[in-house]
Amino acid sequence: LRAVSDTGLFNVLGGTGIIEKVMTQVFWKNLYPQIELWKSKKAQGIETEKVLLRYAVSHIQELIDSEVPGYITEEMYIKPPISQDIKTGAIYKSSKDGLFCIVLSPPCDLAIHGGKFKTDRILVCEIANHDEDNKKVASKSTKRKDKKADIQDAIKNNLTEYYHWLPCNTLFCGGYINFRNVITYPPEEFIAEYGSPVVKVQEYFVKNILNRFSAYYARQGQPDFDFKTEATLILDKIEPAETT
């Protein structure tokens, strides 16, 4: 019990722990002074309970961000996932080939209305094997210090634009999200093959993954046209110039 206590777990989650103190501070300083606002929102038919939950969590995050040390890799994952619903950042294992994938459909597409998803396709990216890909990275150099530098580049996501590192730890075996290996499934097929999520990437990290995923597919942009000429042609078509 002493060993557990020394971790700080009880200090964080105990009845008079840090979370309790922070919540009390947030309640009296940030939320209760705005009670008229929340009463007004409720009168408008807004589901204020869930909004307040999200709002309170964001306040807690603000309070702790400047006080905690650097992240450890386990913080990247939530295991078991809080929700069994299909969520952006949820990691699944295929029942057919045992490969892992991560859901990268935008959260708005995964919203359920009337028992159905807003989208008719679940977008996932395959996760390459952690050790196998690190061996490939290390094999490019002969000296150990160079191998280490190459691996460090890889896990810092500097080696290539289409790989994103997922750390290997006690919660998940890790790997590299391969943005090139994109697959889409109808929701029913996805659920049949993948079942329940194995682990969920924490929201803070999901945003970074989505940003890099979007940037990878937007990197080439659109070829330049002669926009001046095109604009003239379009204007002449919709509003022909008057001839004198």
Question: Where are the model-predicted features located?
Answer:
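Compact nucleic-acid interaction/catalytic patches
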Residues: S105-A138
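Charge-rich interaction segments
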Residues: L1-I91
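Active-site beta-strand-loop-beta-strand hairpin of nuclease catalytic cores
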Residues: K96-G98
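A composition-driven signal for long, intrinsically disordered, charge-rich low-complexity tracts
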Residues: L1-Q25, P106-D109, E161, P167-N169, ...
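Residue-level signal for functionally critical sites in structured catalytic/ligand-binding pockets
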Residues: A56, A90, P106, L110, ...
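Cysteine-centered metal-binding/redox modules
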Residues: I82-A90, S94, I112, K118-R121
